[in-house]
């Protein structure tokens, strides 16, 4: 049966776009991972701004944010609007440790709704300090527990304007996938974002995944072999990889952190020849 309702068609198309972009997130933790994730969720509105933050939950489920945030807009912004985004990012970082007006669901459910419905006086608390002067439309927030470890949670806020499709419904549809990818990728280093890959390490990892040697990578990137070697050592340490094969497998999302190729029953030769298990996070991309 054909779907005649244009609103439904638009909603399905938007969910498909967001899902596709989420599947393109790196399979390894990078310093810009949350920014990229925020950019994916921003597609839920024709014009909107997204803030994503990792958070810890106490025994009562009360949230406090950590110094790991991502900020993005759904479209290109003017210089003044870019400055506003920078200000919002700065505020989000300063929010670290503040108790938020949410309680994390005890199961893998998602708490989602418009901010004025979740808490009537939200403007008087930390969320008000974060969004003061930045809200132009409906502020929609979602909170969900991460599956990797206890007391880990993710907070997503979308200031949505000029949207032809209900952005809250779109967020509800894609939040489970975002939570899954965030848990798999950032969960193991939740307490230590310093182990997330820098832009230079991402460049080197891309080259390693192409099968290039240290010398070839140095020539391609215009750096010394010694510098590239240091980056490769850092990649092995940060991603917990013992071999180059494991490093590539982690980069492609075929091997979870803390699991060795031997544990998966794969020999280095099998990795080199493509005998890898299916990616845990779907079709993932290089960083």
Can you name each region flagged by the protein language model?
Residues 183-203:
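Regulatory hinge/linker segments at domain boundaries
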Residues 209-210, 252:
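Short, locally clustered residues in the helix-turn-helix/winged-helix DNA-binding domain
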Residues 2-13, 17-29, 35-149, 154-163:
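Regulatory input/activation interfaces that engage signals or partners
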Residues 193, 211-246:
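Recognition helix of helix-turn-helix DNA-binding domains
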């Amino acid at each position: 049966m054909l779907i005649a309702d244009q609103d439904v068609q638009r909603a399905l198309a938007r969910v498909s776009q967001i899902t596709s972009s989420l599947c393109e997130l790196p399979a390894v933790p990078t310093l810009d991972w949350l920014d990229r994730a925020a950019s994916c969720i921003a597609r839920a509105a024709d014009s909107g701004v997204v803030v994503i933050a990792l958070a810890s939950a106490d025994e009562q489920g009360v949230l406090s944010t950590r110094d790991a945030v991502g900020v993005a807009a759904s479209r290109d912004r003017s210089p003044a609007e870019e400055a506003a985004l920078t200000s919002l990012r700065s505020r989000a970082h300063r929010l670290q440790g503040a108790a938020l007006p949410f309680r994390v669901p005890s199961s893998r459910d998602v708490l989602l709704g418009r901010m004025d419905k979740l808490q009537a006086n939200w403007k008087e608390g930390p969320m008000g300090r974060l969004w003061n002067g930045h809200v132009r439309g409906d502020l929609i927030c979602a909170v969900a527990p991460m599956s990797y470890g206890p007391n880990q949670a993710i907070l997503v806020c979308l200031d949505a304007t000029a949207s032809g499709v209900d952005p809250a419904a779109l967020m509800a549809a894609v939040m489970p996938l975002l939570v899954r990818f965030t848990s798999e990728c950032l969960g193991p280093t939740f307490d230590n974002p310093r182990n997330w890959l820098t832009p230079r390490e991402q460049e080197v990892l891309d080259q390693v995944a192409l099968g290039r040697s240290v010398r070839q990578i140095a020539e391609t990137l215009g750096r010394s072999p010694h510098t590239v070697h240091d980056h490769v050592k850092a990649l092995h340490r940060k991603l917990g990889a013992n071999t180059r094969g494991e490093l590539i497998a982690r980069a492609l999302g075929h091997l979870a952190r803390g699991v060795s190729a031997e544990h998966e029953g794969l020999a280095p030769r099998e990795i080199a020849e493509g005998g890898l298990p299916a990616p845990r996070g779907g079709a993932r991309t290089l960083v």
